[in-house]
Regions:
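Nudix hydrolase/Nudix homology domain
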Residues: 1-98, 152-156, 218-260
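N-terminal strand-loop-strand
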Residues: 13, 112-158, 162, 184-185, ...
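Acidic, metal-coordinating catalytic segment for phosphate/diphosphate chemistry
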Residues: 84-134
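Hydrophobic alpha-helical positions that pack around
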Residues: 159, 173, 177
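Surface-exposed, charge/polar-rich loops and edge strands
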Residues: 167
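Active-site-adjacent beta-strand/loop module that shapes the phosphate/pyrophosphate-binding cleft
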Residues: 194-219
Length: 260
């Protein structure tokens, strides 16, 4: 069976809530069925209170359906469901970005559940991930935390950036730190990775050690930053740490540093 998850016209994920927990509603179709990127409004109806009413027997009666941004579902769904929903969103986004062949302009068709083919020139394509690095820079018992101008909330994160063509991951780490802060680093070491479906990325985390330099925000991407100790992190107005949410690679790196 093929499994489909549902996003509405605002790119929000459809969730069940049975009064106890949130789960993912889905459509299960035979393997021979042709692939289609369903939207929620094709299979359910919206009612006045912002909830959805099921029009298919696949959705059990008595369950409330809610639409929610994918990022907001991290703390509500199981890790496995969150990852499945992220993959579904990445494929939906990618399908919208590859409606026509890049070589001849012909409308693309689905070849498999994860590839598209041009019926005119027979070219087949697969999703291309946008690979990014993120790094926690150590200076003794301190770590470099920065605030980007693009952050929607008031928190400090880590230096991050996209890998360029012809560049290794380690070269990207070194370049991004220098471009954004004017600092030199060494001892770059891999920490971990995670899918990052915002919209089609792979985030790869590293630790590194400070060598030299004074912090200067040269490229204009950062608004603030500095080296902080675990017991002296930047805080919000309510006294809570102003650091990224637990779903992010940045928080995993920060937690690893604080626990180490």
């Amino acid at each position: 069976m093929k499994r489909y998850y549902l996003f509405d016209e605002h790119d929000e994920l459809l969730l069940y809530h049975d009064g106890k927990e949130y789960t993912l509603p889905r459509l299960d179709l035979p393997d021979e069925a042709s692939f289609h990127a369903f939207s929620a409004d094709e299979v359910v109806g919206r009612v006045s209170n912002g909830k959805f009413r099921s029009s298919l027997p696949a959705f059990p009666e008595g369950h409330d359906l809610f639409a929610m941004p994918l990022r907001a579902t991290y703390r509500l769904l199981s890790p496995a469901d969150y990852q499945r929903a992220g993959k579904a969103w990445e494929l939906l986004y990618w399908s919208e970005q590859t409606a026509y062949c890049g070589r001849c302009g012909t409308a693309m068709q689905w070849a498999t559940a994860i590839s598209r083919r041009c019926p005119q020139c027979d070219g087949e394509i697969w999703p291309q991930l946008n690979t990014a690095i993120i790094v926690l820079v150590h200076k003794g018992d301190e770590a470099l935390l920065v605030k980007a101008k693009t952050f929607h909330r008031n928190f400090f994160g880590l230096v991050a950036g996209f890998v360029e063509t012809g560049e290794s991951l380690e070269e990207c780490v070194e370049r991004e730190v220098f471009e954004e802060t004017s600092l030199r680093i060494t001892n770059i070491r891999y920490f971990g990775s995670q899918p990052w479906p915002y919209p089609l990325g792979l985030m790869i985390g590293f630790h590194a050690d400070y060598v030299s330099g004074d912090i200067r925000f040269a490229d204009g991407e950062l608004a603030d930053g500095g080296f902080f100790r675990p017991d002296d992190l930047p805080t919000n107005a309510d006294g809570s740490p102003a650091i990224p949410g637990t779903e992010s690679m940045a928080r995993r790196l920060i937690n690893d540093w604080m626990e180490g």
